[in-house]
Amino acid sequence: MATEMLTDLLPQVTRGDAETAVAHDVLCLRTGIVNVLLVGEPGAGDREWVLVDAGIYGFTHRIMHEAQERFGDSRPACIVMTHGHFDHVGCLRELSEAWGVPIYAHRLELPYLTGRSAYPPPDPTVGGGLMALSSPLYPRGPFDYGERVRPLPDDGSVPGMPGWQWIHTPGHCPGHVSFWRPDDGVLIVGDAFVTTKQESLLAVLEQRPEIHGPPMYYTQDWDAARRSVQALADLQPEVAATGHGPPLRGAVMRAGLDLLARDFETLAVPRDGRYVRAPAIADERGTVSVPPPVHNRALLIGGVAALALGIIVGARMRRR
């Protein structure tokens, strides 16, 4: 219900979609506020392509339509997940059942995809903007996708994606991974860093191309997030497709990523916040402990006001 509310609260422009060619065999599809990627040669045969992430709730038919346009009646080999936050799993159940495919994720992400653990609470006190202030509404699980969920291979290979490697990039969440193809420098980032200011509704609407750290309100370990950004910057990718924002490529993108890695503490980490003071602790069972919340009375009042305004706008949109 909360996921549907989020979709309704966003103006109609975010319901739009944009397809961007990342490489000849990688298509980035924007589904509202988050991207999914279709990996495989156009016209690939049955079980010869892969979906990366599963978007926000309400875009199942859009994703399947794009897959039909690109691959005909061919089904994917699997769905691979960068991580399991609500905006990346919104269509996961419907798609995995319709296609009859397994779901792969890092071992540390499995508790959140198999009903064993909820994610730590988001922190609405960091980042500013309606997306951050609204974050307590976002579903955090547990989500349970049953026996379809499997761990990524320990050898770093990616099922259904020959030539690709998965890289553990924790911080945003414990089992976050990115996907890397060294032959041509294509990097599928997930939310280890993003290319729009995801905390701001205005930035999300405009999709301004700019490199930022992981979404602040849902990042639970800032030291790990810093190390992950540095590891990705060290790859010197040719093109980076992130979970939020447009794909970026070339020297300008690399310079921005290098700057983010170098000045991560000032550019990405909030000055204060629940997980700035101490990280959430997780293991293969899921969330073990979380630090106490940071209370900000002024921010709370502003958040309630913003939420009320959003509900009014959403109600008016539904009456149209």
Predicted regions and their residues:
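Metallo-beta-lactamase
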Residues: 8-9, 56-57, 109-170, 174-251
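Short, flexible loop segments at boundaries between secondary-structure elements
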Residues: 264-286
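C-terminal/domain-terminus segments
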Residues: 122-134, 163, 239-272
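Hydrophobic alpha-helical topogenic segments used for membrane insertion/localization
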Residues: 292-319
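Active-site metal-binding motif and surrounding structural segment of the metallo-beta-lactamase
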Residues: 60-105
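Conserved beta-strand hairpin/beta-sheet module of binuclear metal-dependent hydrolase folds
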Residues: 12-71, 179-190, 195
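Residue-level marker for buried hydrophobic side chains located in beta-strands
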Residues: 50-52, 80, 103, 186-188, ...
